[in-house]
């Protein structure tokens, strides 16, 4: 990997973890971890037929937050900084990766979430940022990038700064979708400067009314 570097993430053993462990690691190490195929014991049909509560239990194989948490507490007030953008695309299409690589030459991972299928693609997009950013900067940056890709493709709650992301897993009868692009880390200041005033949240891209 040509474009590597260190960043902070916070790791939890499950979504119910009360304390999260801050860890500094290389982007290449994180990419390697994200590339590991983790099969669960149920079939895809069994998973989508399960209750929302049972689905959560199945896909809870531990997870991470793409930043540093004060005191290891996963609340918005305790997000000290973010340097890893993690966004869920729950309304995606199968050609998303091809479209993304035409729009961006930056470092990125795109992988399928547990409910991903060819018929109904669901992805997670992960991109390292050029520097540590504040919570407000993170939301402005991630919404701008989502706006370029197509913000209606994204889960509307995915921009939360303390958002937990499960480690990837797949039902036992499904293939794991995983793509990597090596490139420069996306320039946080360039994205912020693309706004007339990035602090004005009314300028941030938002989903159309049918997705709100």
Regions found by a protein language model. Give the residues of each.
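Generic secondary-structure boundary/loop-capping signal
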Residues: 76, 126, 162-164
